[in-house]
Design a protein with these regions (language model features):
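Short acidic/polar hinge/loop motifs at secondary-structure boundaries
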Residues: 105-133
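Outer-membrane beta-barrel pore domains and translocons
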Residues: 33, 134, 152, 165-171, ...
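Extracytoplasmic beta-strand/coil segments of soluble accessory domains associated
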Residues: 63, 67-105, 127
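Periplasmic-side early beta-strands and strand-to-turn transitions of outer-membrane beta-barrels
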Residues: 138, 150, 157-159, 167, ...
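Non-catalytic regulatory/gating segments with a bias toward low-complexity or hydrophobic composition
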Residues: 54, 66, 129-130, 149-151, ...
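N-terminal periplasmic "start-of-domain" segments of outer-membrane beta-barrel proteins
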Residues: 27-57, 86
Length: 336
């Protein structure tokens, strides 16, 4: 099944009271095209979870971190680590809350309603999360009635750095993070590697059978400044996960039901700035593969991918006064 969407966007953002903006004014990304706006002028309820809060959280999975620091949301998770995890905004169904990762629309074309679940997103390599509550349809499309969750990965900092972190806990759980990053005047990079492994617990009562979960993932973020006016940015994420779970049959306790997922997202941006103009041409890709095994040993495969081409132009009078225009074309496809 294939679907093609084309969207034209023309927006005028004017806030006369903020023609002059102090250098320390907090800014927030309010669209997948990364249009900057000071947080005080955002016309929606918004919550920002910064890198300090994410790093200090005792949770390893990003969905649980969001639930810890965000309010007035419906959070649900089926079973332990690896179980379906989602956040509902404004009390609406999950499909009415869109998720973006570095500008990539994370909607699974192979799922019945296109929903994307957060169960395979770990917190490693995540710089911040911005949650816009309330309808965002004009910026994000018709699915963003409840709101939008924008997730941004880390970028390299000046110099050369490396970090390693090892965590262990009950149920033979291990969480290993390693990252290296750096930057100079022309180039910046961040690469984060993560392995999460646990024996898990059973979703069913009255048995001690384990439902294991494994997550191997990598996050990469790269930027290169060709000259004073032109730069290139590329971010990617790859995750290979395996999850065992129980059927609804009470007579079965260790039935070998499992799902093996592969998720890949990539965003490539060409950015040109001159005077008050900024033009961004981007290509975003999402690919999801799911391999399921039922209690009889029968296997079923699901494939979904999304390709999007975006052009975003800005004429900036100031931080909060600008004209934004652009066009977007998407191709969704799925098969079994």
């Amino acid at each position: 099944m294939k679907k093609i969407y084309t969207i034209l966007l023309i927006t005028l953002i004017l806030n006369p009271a903020n023609i002059l903006v102090a250098e320390d004014t907090p800014i927030i990304v309010i669209s997948a095209g990364k249009t900057l706006q000071s947080i005080d002028t955002v016309g929606s309820t918004i919550e920002v979870i910064d890198s300090e809060a994410i790093n200090n959280s005792s949770y390893s999975m990003l969905g649980e971190v969001i639930n810890e620091f965000s309010t007035s949301n419906n959070f649900f998770q089926t079973g332990g680590s690896g179980g379906n995890t989602a956040i509902q905004l404004r009390g609406l169904e999950k499909r009415y809350s869109t998720v973006y990762l570095d500008g990539v629309k994370m909607m699974d074309p192979s799922s019945p309603d296109g929903s994307f679940y957060l169960d395979n997103l770990t917190k490693n390599g995540i710089e911040r999360v911005e949650i816009l509550k309330g309808t965002q349809s004009s910026l994000y499309g018709s699915n963003a009635i409840g709101g939008t969750i924008n997730i941004f990965t880390k970028k390299g900092e000046i110099g050369k750095h490396s970090d390693i972190e090892v965590e262990t806990s009950s149920e033979n759980t291990k969480n290993i993070n390693y990252s290296f990053h750096g930057a100079n005047k022309k180039f910046n990079y961040f690469i984060g590697l993560n392995k999460y492994l646990t024996d898990g617990i059973s979703q069913m009562n009255d048995n001690d059978e384990k439902d294991m979960y494994r997550n191997d993932n990598i996050i990469g973020n790269f930027g290169y400044e060709v000259n004073d006016n032109f730069s290139i940015e590329n971010s990617l994420r790859f995750a290979d996960t395996f999850y065992e779970y129980d059927t609804v049959l009470k007579s079965r306790t260790d039935d070998g039901v499992s799902t093996d997922n592969i998720e890949f997202s990539n965003s490539l941006k060409l950015i040109h700035k001159k005077d008050n103009f900024k033009n961004t041409l981007s290509y975003n890709k999402l690919q999801i593969e799911r391999y399921t095994t039922d209690y009889l040993g029968a296997k079923q495969n699901y494939f979904g991918h999304r390709d999007a081409f975006n052009y975003l132009g800005e004429y900036n009078l100031s931080l909060d006064n600008k004209i934004v225009y652009g066009v977007e074309s998407e191709l969704d496809a799925s098969r079994m």
